[in-house]
């Protein structure tokens, strides 16, 4: 059983009631669990045709978030008992970078959930929901050039992949007053 803090309630309220959110808090406060993992699972269960992208400061970190979501669909006995089997069929992709649930009724080139590290290529992709979780880290916030590169990637590569009626939710920790979260 999880202890839900006021911060978690605030994040849940924000992402449930707005198409564009920014939630910042120190490391270790559970932002990712509530605003990333739990939210992705909820959205996928509600709409198996959804296309969600989880972005993080590195590909490895983005894949770790995706793996946590995917593992719930593979091993969470309560989720499987209540909602059934959502794992892959022989035609669906199911790996560390992306997965597609077997309940989809519309053919789409994008997976149900895709993991992408900051500065990764997103050409020809379109997403209904983008979750930027810890896009900013010490490694890309120290210098003006690093901050500028991240902002350029975010606004000219990532943001245009969001569908016109899509949602974008950013979760993170501030590392510099002039970082992406300014």
Ranges and model annotations:
Residues 1-182:
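Short, flexible loop motifs at catalytic/binding sites
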């Amino acid at each position: 059983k999880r202890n839900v803090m006021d911060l978690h309630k605030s994040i849940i309220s924000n992402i449930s009631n707005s198409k564009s959110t920014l939630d910042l808090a120190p490391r270790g406060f559970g932002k990712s669990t509530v605003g990333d993992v739990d939210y992705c699972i909820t959205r996928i269960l509600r709409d198996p045709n959804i296309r969600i992208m989880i972005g993080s400061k590195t590909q490895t970190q983005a894949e770790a978030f995706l793996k946590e979501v995917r593992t719930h669909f593979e091993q969470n006995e309560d989720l499987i008992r209540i909602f059934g089997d959502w794992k892959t069929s022989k035609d669906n992709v199911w790996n560390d970078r992306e997965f597609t649930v077997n309940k989809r009724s519309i053919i789409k080139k994008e997976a149900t959930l895709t993991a992408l590290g900051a500065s990764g290529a997103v050409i020809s992709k379109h997403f209904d929901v983008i979750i930027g979780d810890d896009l900013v880290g010490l490694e890309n916030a120290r210098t003006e050039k690093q901050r500028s590169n991240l902002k350029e990637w975010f606004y000219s590569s990532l943001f245009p992949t969001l569908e016109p009626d899509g949602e974008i939710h950013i979760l993170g920790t501030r590392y510099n007053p002039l970082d992406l979260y300014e």
